């Protein structure tokens, strides 16, 4: 019911990690190790502490065998709308080396890799990650790091244009999506690429289930967000458990993002899939606010990235008390956690008090920096007036009477949830 993700490397003190997990009430770990043999070493250690192990495996993006496949199969790599292949192009970071899901040889390669891990005795399941395309849109808080604004889909980050993908689409629909003025507006083309990723996920599920193991995944926050951002329509995947990465610090920075996403996930997930909620570790009270937001909105468990982020003895002790209490509630309720928030995701940014407080704090910081002062000044804001709306973007203009500053405030809605915001002075 309480899980974590963790990288495993030979020589690490894995026993002490498992002891900490057991002490604070965690019962499962999605472990990323270089080889199947590493799991054969790690699993007995985890089981000694009552910890269940899933193999946390990258699929469409290469990890441990990246250089080998680049050298041997450069034609396997994903291509963007500009015709650039990841075999010789970088998208954001050097380790983004995604394969094309339409290629039969890529699917065969992934299937054989999954089999090699499924053959590990004692491994309970497979949790796939990076089963998607390159981010056509990054989470909003990452934009400044790359010096970009992704208010719509741009060609350089729009992947899935490998010749095999284009030919497969054309044979089904009779046209090349590149012939359109703006291919990003073609819903059939977007969904087709999502479906190629879904076919890979369900191929993997078939392999995993043939070994009698649990099929899990760590996708983007919701199926609708993931479809837009990374072509990952995971509500159609044959998963036993899903651990969506609802990392609020990457998006709105407010805990309400977790509630909104979880409500959407209850609605849009595969009916046969048990919904958990993945979140970043916080060594403080916000950790428990985040877990409450997920469990009160319909999640049946929690995954924390990662247990190493829970450092203080105070938080560890409180985490143990929390996990014990949640298990007691679940046991008393027939093995499920009932949602207590019977609402839909709120797409009105102005009713999200936490988000608007962050927006205004950003405004105050802008005014303070412009005046050369450290103290954040009070605001006297006028009425927000919408100036523009396109794709997933809504723009507003608002003036502060105190500083005579006019702000442009932008909200982003990828999927059916408020997924990001920005503030600049005009």
What is the role of each PLM region?
Residues 1-15, 219:
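Boundary/entry segment of secreted carbohydrate-active catalytic domains
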Residues 5, 26-33, 92-108, 186-196, ...:
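The substrate-binding groove and active-site-proximal loops of carbohydrate-active enzymes
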Residues 54-118:
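Active-site-adjacent "subsite" loops/lids of carbohydrate-active enzymes
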Residues 62-90, 131-178:
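Aromatic- and acidic-residue-enriched segments that line the glycan-binding/catalytic groove
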Residues 136, 214-252:
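Substrate-binding cleft/loops of secretory-pathway carbohydrate-active enzymes
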Residues 244-255, 271-336:
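Substrate-binding cleft of secreted/luminal carbohydrate-active enzymes
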